[in-house]
């Protein structure tokens, strides 16, 4: 960011909050579509003259787009006439896709500048292990043992586009950019009526920015009320801008609670609440207070309806008791398992038995969901019986084995934290036999004859990678014991979901 600061005049943008002129600068387009900087967009760059043959950037397309934006006065076009606007006709979806990427990059500039300025002069502790997906499970294992009730909320999406514009208006005070942002959103909705593929106009970075802005606004309000009880608040919570009518709406929510719960308003100050957000859901955990969970359920419904004007159905807010119900959390079925124990105690000459209960944080594999995902990808049928992967028979034998080993290794690493490994062994069995059937089909042979000719070397490849990693972590004596296969292992290098793991 410092490298391009003088070239793009970010200081001037920061002082005046004028982002709209950046849409007319060719250098910003180069920055937006640079493969080294734009890591969120895994697709090919669309700033190519011919994406199939020539992979050089074309500034000619950028100049054409800038000229079109100069010629069109889109700020005065009514919403009802957007379908007749020649600026983004059906034949010009190419230009809209470029503008959606550019808009996400430009609007991120003030956030990046404010984030850098807030961390200046501060020494931040680097905790790379906390970036792992598995890092949350040791926290839950330590905290949820003392909590009984969990409130699970599915974060609703805003129905009307003006809600997204209003959310962004609290942070971007450039009227021209906001009008242009509104115009792009309505154009995208109008394109849904055309007979085109959704992937042709979908830009991940643009919609990630919209979703994160929506969630950031919700969490900033929630953390403002519950910052003392939130143990997982974001480190960038200091980067919050002022909001229009923010405190007025806070007072409105307080009045709602005072009128409905005049004598029990103190639950807002309860410190024994933990908050976790994942995959469009959030959970709140508390101890021995079902009434508190019911109040928070009522609170969430009023929060979304009063502040965000979004109708939140009560069915999307579930109260679960961990000792009886299971919680679907990041691909695991989590619950609290109560194991009764009888302890023999002796005091002087008297011997007596003490009955106690041991609480264990249990994590299981959702085997039915994973088999459904494997069946969808043609690795097995709906009953879990392996079948050959016919679409891979054109590849070489080494490439086929490498694909199956990679998938098996990813699933094995992710679900290594399961309390019971029986379902994990079943998944490995499906992938191994599917690999053998695929190779046998390619060579026009039977499974028995192919295994007899190849030997046991094929099946050993599925265990080599996992065995090397585990042997580096644990001593050889412990690695050779059976306890390793019964205990849970959390890997702190998992930064993203595998496609087959993310089966929601």
UniProtKB/Swiss-Prot annotation:
CC per GO annotation: chloroplast
GO molecular function: RNA binding
Recorded superkingdom: Eukaryota
A single BP term in Gene Ontology: tRNA processing
Protein localization: Plastid, Chloroplast
Keywords associated with the record: Chloroplast, mRNA processing, Plastid, RNA-binding, tRNA processing
UniProt main location, coarse: plastid
Family that this chain belongs to: Belongs to the intron maturase 2 family. MatK subfamily.
Cited function: Usually encoded in the trnK tRNA gene intron. Probably assists in splicing its own and other chloroplast group II introns.
Name of the protein this chain belongs to: Maturase K
Gene: matK
